[in-house]
């Protein structure tokens, strides 16, 4: 008789919750709401470096901006230059952790790169120059402020840049994290 009571209980529940049931039911919507998990915020920035492309979050901390993701990437932009990059894997074996310092020498700036165990080299740069230009978008364009800096690595002339919108909010960075490699780009994903 216990089995019969269970059947009656299940039928009662079905009648209670199943009444007026249709393809779109209030009961089903309520259950979805209870068990639905919010996936949370989505990263709005893209980091690119030598074939690696990662979506990252931008976290403002006073004058600094930290770019990070759940895979362990952390880039510290102090508002003037990137001074630290951690957790980037250009290949599956080694994680790169690089510290960057800037010193002024005469009318130039020297960026020094250091890995976890050794110095990686230096880059000599002219003072930054600011200009206004148009940035092409998928639809139309937007006027931006571009701060560029010409640099010399061994015998190569290279460029670093900071792109700001007209209210001087960051839109993109192009910088060197290692003097022997290509530049890193971090940009707002909507551009």
Give the location of each predicted region:
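Bacterial N-terminal signal peptides that target proteins for export
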Residues: 1-9
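Positively charged, low-complexity intrinsically disordered regions
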Residues: 7-8, 56, 85, 188
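Sec-dependent N-terminal signal peptides
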Residues: 8-16
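C-terminal motif of bacterial Sec signal peptides marking the signal peptidase cleavage site
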Residues: 18-20
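Acidic, serine/threonine-rich low-complexity disordered tracts
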Residues: 22-75, 100-191
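Mid-chain, structured segments of secreted extracytoplasmic proteins
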Residues: 71-102
